[in-house]
């Protein structure tokens, strides 16, 4: 959870006084093994945006470890060049998700006060560079609540649509995150993006791109997630932690969470909930 950016809404930002941690290869292996025991066959690897602490080689080694345990590997890391994405693909990564946060470039500058993330165009083009690097799929998201959510949702959808036309083979995915409170700032909230507005965004993505994957994360509560998978969402996470080293008890140097989660159910509990809704759980 080391980061070089100053994003005022994120718990990992470089000026937020939190416990920082970085897992070594042995600790990563332990975490992966613990997660794999739950039955999950897909893993999402995240870092803070610090090339100094989490360089491409380090992320690549994490992908190689993950390949021992999981069929599908996703990345949410800092934007990279095409050759770097190609290296990570060779190490086992299948898809890349990049949150643009907001597509309003003026608002973007007021939210990202320092670090490489301030470079709006470089982040905007990350998904295309990932596809050029051989990634099978790419994910798109705006952090709903930072700016006008309807404009950001429209821009997210159009961004994905343009790349789908240019790269017809690409697997396209949407995430629909709303702002959540962070350590040292529990007043952060998604402003006017309430549950009906979130449903509107999810349904708009589904109507606009019928074959895209739509993820609803543990930022949302159990009730909302259970309802959305019955309407338009296709992927939900389970047994989640946004902290560092939180899946294994004997990792002593644990890092603080990126944000508060709302649905703390285990993999088994989410699996059962899907069955109770007459849905078929698929683990990868």
Give the ranges of each region predicted by the language model.
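Short Fe-S-cluster ligation motifs
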Residues: 30-50
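Canonical Radical SAM [4Fe-4S] cluster-binding loop centered on the CxxxCxxC motif
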Residues: 1-27
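Conserved strand-turn element in the central/C-terminal portion of the radical SAM core barrel
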Residues: 43, 50-53, 76, 80, ...
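Glycine-rich tight-turn/loop motif centered on a GG-T
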Residues: 15-22, 52-57, 108-120, 186-192, ...
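Auxiliary Fe-S-binding modules of radical SAM enzymes
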Residues: 165-284
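Radical SAM/AdoMet-radical enzyme domain recognition
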Residues: 7, 41-43, 55-143
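Surface-exposed amphipathic alpha-helices with a cationic face
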Residues: 36, 60-68, 89, 131, ...
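Catalytic cores of alpha/beta
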Residues: 81-90, 136, 146-162, 221-231
